[in-house]
Amino acid sequence: MTFTRFVEAGRVALVSYGEHLNKLVVIVDILDQNRILVDSPSHGLKRKVINVKRIALTSIKVDDIARGAPVAEVKSKYTAAKVDETFAASGWGKKLAKREKRAALDDFGRFKVMVARMKKSKAINAELAKLKA
């Protein structure tokens, strides 16, 4: 298998560090080997220079974005490509959504999850006991 996730204009990435953690961005321009210019139309992140080490490249690419494309062009092509929906439907997006949902639980929510897991385990063990008998 060849590597297909290149740092290129139009590539969608996920910020993995800092104040914009877990936000999707589009690479607009490559400044040097360590820094890139990114823009995020859907998350309210204005055009910003970010270190390459602080992003994780996704397999999603917005087509026909030239280096240094204007903000309006990036926004229109981002929405046309349905990047947010595509990422949310991916395994990576589902995992992040699940993690955020669990982190937002209060004490009673965690208790309900624990009780549900106990009921599930009890039902599985009961069926297993029937099969063994």
UniProtKB/Swiss-Prot annotation:
GO terms for cellular component: cytosolic large ribosomal subunit. Keywords: Ribonucleoprotein, Ribosomal protein. GO terms for biological process: ribosomal large subunit biogenesis; translation. SUPFAM superfamilies: Translation proteins SH3-like domain. GO terms for molecular function: RNA binding; structural constituent of ribosome. Belongs to the eukaryotic ribosomal protein eL14 family. This is Large ribosomal subunit protein eL14. The lineage of its organism: Eukaryota, Rhodophyta, Florideophyceae, Rhodymeniophycidae, Ceramiales.
